[in-house]
Regions:
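Conserved FAD-binding catalytic core of PHBH/FMO-like flavoproteins
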Residues: 37-186
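Active-site-adjacent segment of FAD-dependent monooxygenases/related oxidoreductases
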Residues: 1-42, 46, 57, 134
Length: 186
């Protein structure tokens, strides 16, 4: 953990080993697409049938079954609700609308490819499988390696100033630079 200026505030050596020891499983940073692909591939190996391009109309947890907008009903052993922020599956299970709750944070996301980085110090930083946090006034940042150290994900969090009802908007690079002026250059 770093102060926004770069000063190290705390460090946990062997974080991944400690996680494995404590939980009996590894700590892994994955790109969401890689996780989705791994789950999809394994499910196919186990014989799961996928029906793509269907909208869920209803989920009956007692069945369990799923009924789509086109009227098809699918009986299942298990229904996995992984349909995102505005989840219809969650709404069906709860029996009521469950809109996302604002966190007060707005996230700028940046993914860098190691091949794009020329600075040797930054290349070494990115290639290490470590998670870094920076804490600053009214903002914080998280950075970690992806794809075996070939990519680096950075999430910059600032107070949310989007209008009500707007969940996503193109970022403004100049605004972001201003918000993080004086921060650790790494």
């Amino acid at each position: 953990m770093h102060q926004y200026s770069g000063t190290v505030l705390a460090r946990e050596p062997d974080f991944d080993k400690n996680i494995r020891r404590k939980y009996g499983a590894p700590f892994v940073d994955l790109h969401r697409v890689d996780l989705q692909r791994a789950l999809y591939d394994r499910a196919q190996e186990l014989g799961v049938k996928f029906q793509l391009d269907e909208r869920v109309e209803n989920v009956d947890p007692a069945g369990p079954s799923v009924t789509t907008k086109s009227g098809h009903k699918y009986d299942a052993d298990l229904v996995v609700g992984a349909d995102g922020l505005w989840s219809r599956t969650r709404q069906c299970f709860l029996g009521t609308a469950d809109e996302p709750k604002p966190t007060g944070d707005l996230a700028y996301r940046i993914v860098l490819s190691l091949s794009q980085i020329e600075d040797p110090v930054l290349r070494l930083w990115i290639s290490k499988p470590e998670v870094h946090f920076w804490i600053g006034p009214r903002s914080h940042a998280v950075g970690y390696s992806l794809k075996g150290g070939n990519m680096y994900n950075i999430v910059l969090l600032v107070p949310d100033d989007l209008p009500p009802g707007v969940a996503k908007e193109s970022g403004n690079v100049e605004e972001m630079k201003k918000l993080f002026e004086g921060w650790d250059p790494v």
